[in-house]
Amino acid sequence: MAFGLTGAAYLNIDVMVKSAGTKLKQARVLSSRISFRGPVFSVTTDEVEEPGGVRARRDVIRHSGSIVVLAVDDQASHDPDNHDLAIVDSAKAARKAEPRILLERQYRHAAQSMMWELPAGRIDDGETSLTAAKRELLEETGYSARQWKRILHFYVSPGFLDETMTIYLARGLQAGEAQPEPDEKIATRFFALSEAKRMALNGRIRDAKTISGILWLAQTARAAR
């Protein structure tokens, strides 16, 4: 069978799904202890009884959650040589109408490489996700935005991490001065949506939250046409 599952395994999964939906919606935590505590996250070691009666030890990274900013420049580009779009050919005008996405490039030690990413950061204690999004965009890029909309909310890696990410769409951008943290060395650049989508699909962009945001915008733009 697919994925090497036997009929019994399929039956067991079906029982777990049914029990999760009707009898046991969450695991019963039998014991929990903090096995690591750091400035950004902690780790708990939990003894649990999960849906279907499975008992297991789970090490879970605990995180306060993060935000991601999909900052879009809809006034993509005025032509420095000719501001009269009425006399520009239709293909050039179409290119001008394409939105641009603000990306950051920085070194990521865990990935051992430079990465293109959307602006993002952790939600501090006492902050709302929107407040954190506005703060991170300004700190990392120097931009502020007049329009904000929450578009996506998801778990990063729910097998061992409880962190969620919320992506905000930011429009009406206004340039300012970046205020990065001392250990942040960030370069920023605008990419046309079509180019950013190619980068997401050909592997040049390898960051999951960034790929999610870019493909959301590409799909939304396509549906609006």
State where each predicted segment sits.
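Conserved hydrophobic/aromatic beta-strand scaffold that supports enzyme active sites
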Residues: 40-47, 103, 167-169, 188-190
